[in-house]
Amino acid sequence: MEKLNVAIADDNERMVDLLSTLVKGDKELELVGQAADGQEIYKIIKEKEPDVVLLDIIMPKMDGITVMEKVNEDPSVRKRPAFIIIS
């Protein structure tokens, strides 16, 4: 079975560490990126094309809602990830 690629975005470092540990501990998941702000995760989504993004709503530089809107509007994003909202 092919692994699901996962990216994480949260400005809370402890939350990112916790979620990263959980993802890395699951043999069916592959962590492809971590970000502390919306601009950074948007760049990761475009470059790494994750299957799933664990996304905080309230983040600096760009909030999670704006990230989702930009991804859905950007024709250069070939693979649309599933977003899971975290807080």
Task: Name the predicted role of every residue range.
Residues 48-54:
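Active-site beta3 strand of CheY-like receiver
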Residues 37-40, 63-69:
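Acidic catalytic/metal-coordinating carboxylates
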Residues 10, 56:
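Active-site residues of response regulator receiver
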Residues 5, 13-33:
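Two-component/phosphorelay signaling modules centered on CheY-like receiver
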Residues 59:
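Receiver (REC) domain active-site loop signature in two-component systems and cognate sites
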Residues 46-48, 72-80:
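Conserved phosphotransfer cores of two-component systems
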